[in-house]
Amino acid sequence: MTRSLNEALLEGERLRPFGRQVTSPAQGQTLADVPIEELLALALGAKVVVLRGFGLLGKAELENYCRAAGEILQWNFGSILDLVVRDTPENYLFDRGDVPFHWDGAFAEQVPRFFLFQCVQGEGSGGETVFCDSVQVYREAPEDLKELWARATITYRTDKLAHYGGLAEWPLLGTHPATGETTIRYAEPLDPARYANPLFLTVDGISAEDGVRVMEDLRERLHDARYCYAHEWQTGDIVVAENHSLLHGRNAFTGSVARHLQRIQII
């Protein structure tokens, strides 16, 4: 790593309320010039890292780059998901509407530590990717709510119409494997009247009344602007996110939907 790039990674620009943006210090640099372990270490602390001015990698190069840091999560389509709006979407991820909060890997055999997006084409209005710092949400929650959360287990059910689906059961609270911090593991329910491939939730471990209270509270608390960073995409952006502490989703598109993201997940 050159000294100038090292300084750029260490300094960067702080995002609000969390995250860091790093701009390439010289022309001609690509993602491959950023050591993956340095990048993930930065992402572990900042939770979200935005790289601008770095050239994107082809799919094979991107997979090799990320594999240097660990195993890559594989799906039926391979390791890299092309996120584009489709004319007849079988899943809400490919629709022009919003994507409620969730975490990656709820229906997978292993939960990824990080995921990385490349923005191949970023033109359009709306569609910001929104990240919620669940660690901070937990820290600032009232004690009586924390006690309910600690007893709650949620079963998620969705038809496998895309690359994931079935049944998954998770405690509402988790422990971050690297930092030991308490995290919130929650995927918001998806109303079948609004979303392709809806998601249904059952809350166990607490009373039905408390289950309703928990879900209604999370609907408001997780979307509090104090805990959320909304990324407005530009063509060429690279975003690395820490999957254990964050929940993420997407705002609905309000105009053109000619956007193309590529996503890969590192276990």
Residue positions per predicted region:
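Active-site environment of non-heme Fe oxygenases that use a 2-His-1-carboxylate facial triad
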Residues: 2-30, 44, 80-235, 240-267
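Short, acidic/polar
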Residues: 32-40
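Structured binding elements
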Residues: 47
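Structural motif
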Residues: 52-55
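Glycine-rich loop at the start of a catalytic domain that most often binds anionic cofactors/ligands
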Residues: 59-70
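Beta-solenoid repeat scaffold
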Residues: 69-77
